[in-house]
Amino acid sequence: MQPDLLSRKTAALTLQKFHTLSPLTHCMTNDVVQTFTANTLLALGASPAMVIETEEASQFAAVASALLINVGTLTQARAHAMRAAVVHAKRVKTPWTLDPVAVGSLDYRRHFCTELLSLNPDAIRGNASEIMALAGVSNSGRGVDSTDVVANALPAAVMLAQETGAVVVVTGEVDYVTDGRRTVGVGGGDPLMTKVVGTGCALSAVVAACCALPGDRLLNVASACSWMKQAGERAIVRSQGPGTFVPYFLDALWQMTQEVEA
């Protein structure tokens, strides 16, 4: 039995709330996607901050609305800073999100992400291979690319949510979002989104920001997935390929926020 799909009306109402609150989102993310991630958050009305130095990162967790940990370009120094930020975020009750990039194919980051799971993230976002590897079900995956079908990863996502208390997002042609008890699907988007570096990482930042919103975290996080897929659908109408897709995608996010505020 397939999960119910999130309604776009729910996503629009959540976007109103998001734009009003403008979450200050601390992004400890990878070097490849920082600009695109920041621009995605700005287009939706959030406030991004890229603070990575250990002493500053732990301090900033006290003032941020939400924290993102993305291990895409992980180093020992960065792992130390991320660990310190998460510990402090937990202390001051700042919600944090884990993006376990390529966790299935590299031992160092898999061990690090497993360690972070003990600090109970509020959300986890990954592709099918990453979620299955993080749950200990499989070590497949080709770097950042998924080699598994999204539906096959759903049981692992449910198990991971039950074990950690996180809302877990498995992204693909249909995104599945689960808190271990309830699961919703988010359809839409366009295959070209997989040909642009950073769309998944940017989604993780939006998921992190949505964890700062009041109300139902499952629906808030699922709404983040919906906004990104809707923007992809709008962008593909005007773009001619990956190079023109990105500016149209950011424009679409911005236009969506203007529409819900009208």
Curated annotation (Swiss-Prot):
This protein's name: Hydroxyethylthiazole kinase
Pathway: Cofactor biosynthesis; thiamine diphosphate biosynthesis; 4-methyl-5-(2-phosphoethyl)-thiazole from 5-(2-hydroxyethyl)-4-methylthiazole: step 1/1
Gene3D superfamilies named among the record's database cross-references: 3.40.1190.20
The encoding gene: thiM
Protein task: Catalyzes the phosphorylation of the hydroxyl group of 4-methyl-5-beta-hydroxyethylthiazole (THZ).
InterPro entries the UniProt entry points to: Hyethyz_kinase, Ribokinase-like
Binding site for ATP: R125, T171
GO MF annotation, one: magnesium ion binding
Residues binding substrate, per UniProt: M50, G198
Substrates-to-products reaction catalysed: 5-(2-hydroxyethyl)-4-methylthiazole + ATP = 4-methyl-5-(2-phosphooxyethyl)-thiazole + ADP + H(+)
Source taxon at top rank: Bacteria
Cofactor dependency: Mg(2+)
Disulphide bridges, residue numbers: none
Keywords: ATP-binding, Kinase, Magnesium, Metal-binding, Nucleotide-binding, Thiamine biosynthesis, Transferase
Organism for this UniProt entry: Escherichia fergusonii (strain ATCC 35469 / DSM 13698 / CCUG 18766 / IAM 14443 / JCM 21226 / LMG 7866 / NBRC 102419 / NCTC 12128 / CDC 0568-73)
Coiled coil: none
EC number(s) given by UniProt: 2.7.1.50
